[in-house]
Amino acid sequence: MGSQATTYHMAMYPWFGVGHLTGFFRLANKLAGKGHRISFLIPKNTQSKLESFNLHPHLISFVPIVVPSIPGLPPGAETTSDVPFPSTHLLMEAMDKTQNDIEIILKDLKVDVVFYDFTHWLPSLARKIGIKSVFYSTISPLMHGYALSPERRVVGKQLTEADMMKAPASFPDPSIKLHAHEARGFTARTVMKFGGDITFFDRIFTAVSESDGLAYSTCREIEGQFCDYIETQFQKPVLLAGPALPVPSKSTMEQKWSDWLGKFKEGSVIYCAFGSECTLRKDKFQELLWGLELTGMPFFAALKPPFETESVEAAIPEELKEKIQGRGIVHGEWVQQQLFLQHPSVGCFVSHCGWASLSEALVNDCQIVLLPQVGDQIINARIMSVSLKVGVEVEKGEEDGVFSRESVCKAVKAVMDEKSEIGREVRGNHDKLRGFLMNADLDSKYMDSFNQKLQDLLG
């Protein structure tokens, strides 16, 4: 079983979040590149959205899943992009109700191992039918170490806001901390039910602690100390697939955007994007735009319409429209983010700190401004600003978490000023990290190690 030629049949059943589906599929492509066969379990109408990502159609096959109907869940909803954020717990409840179907499918497929994330019941199901289970996380191991460490769990004691503001006792980097408003949000998730009668934290803790192994898309050079911490705390082997870097885009930028960006000098444009699932309140949306305007730089903001607003145009104050005419675009639809970040006119990226977006930023020249909104985005921002020092985080109120237009402007100007100490530091660190990440042998090195550890686990 130790031979490098050993191949396996693997199943994958990720949470129905768009970022989770694409993250798992990225790993599927890497594993198929090693000769493994992958059965990818996915809601039947969502399959078409991932087919173009399949680099190994002879080894990766889709297994359609019917998402059960749940009271309150929109008809036909299959992923988080189909439901409003407050209703995602209903989608989780629907996913939990696929348990019997998944057992039948896994028995029929006769797989060797199943990769999963939010389905905390899958490890026990896998054991029952004699297969291994690996928890694969699309978020940082630092996040799991900070928030889920067994060190934090005391029987009969509820985690408090004060507990969450500081790292666990033996955490390798005590400088990583949460602000009061962030800790409040994390603490709320320890009691918030997420799909049936289980809290979000208990769901993830069970999913991690019941697994046979833990897998992450990162590298030791960036998060090695946190991977070691998790391995020690959970007593599970940790498999690293290397950083989740974007596959180079084969498409070309829409002509209208290329023409617009081409009007400005190299490295002068701010690109701001908050992902496909992040929706801001109207006041935050407007304050962010005022902050971009205050920099005096041209900007392109790709943002979803704020809550209770039909379009981005309707949410922009008339005074602001006048001020940004000719140098600012606010766009409410999807754009080709990789191509924007690669464009020579773009010099700054204001991000909500989703890991996929940050990965795209790290392999490009643009400077990074961090404006996290929820959950793992907050920890991602600390990795970038505190551990790696490759970006600057927008200052917020300690208690209320509110940012101002002035704080947005200040962060942008800090990273864009090549003569300032902060500007020089983040640029230098970013350049070094980009050089490391672009090493052609990096991915194959990590996947060789991942493959060997997987063989050890299954052997």
Swiss-Prot record:
GO BP annotations listed: anthocyanin-containing compound biosynthetic process
Gene Ontology molecular functions: anthocyanidin 3-O-glucoside 2''-O-glucosyltransferase activity; UDP-glucosyltransferase activity
CDD domains associated with the record: GT1_Gtf-like
Chemical reaction(s) catalysed: an anthocyanidin 3-O-beta-D-glucoside + UDP-alpha-D-glucose = an anthocyanidin 3-O-sophoroside + UDP + 2 H(+)
Residues reported to bind UDP-alpha-D-glucose: 138, 335, 337, 352, 355, 357, 360, 376-377
UniProt keywords, alphabetically: Glycosyltransferase, Transferase
Enzyme Commission no: 2.4.1.297
Enzyme class, UniProt record, top EC level: transferase
Pathway recorded for this protein: Pigment biosynthesis; anthocyanin biosynthesis
Superkingdom of the source species: Eukaryota
Sequence positions that bind an anthocyanidin: 20, 375
Location of the active site: 20, 117
Family: Belongs to the UDP-glycosyltransferase family.
PANTHER family tied to this protein: GLYCOSYLTRANSFERASE, UDP-GLYCOSYLTRANSFERASE 79B30-LIKE
Biological role: Glycosyltransferase that mediates the glucosylation of anthocyanidin 3-O-glucosides to yield anthocyanidin 3-O-sophorosides. 3-O-sophoroside derivatives are required for the color of flowers.
Protein name: Anthocyanidin 3-O-glucoside 2''-O-glucosyltransferase
Species for this entry: Ipomoea purpurea
Lineage start: Eukaryota, Viridiplantae, Streptophyta, Embryophyta, Tracheophyta
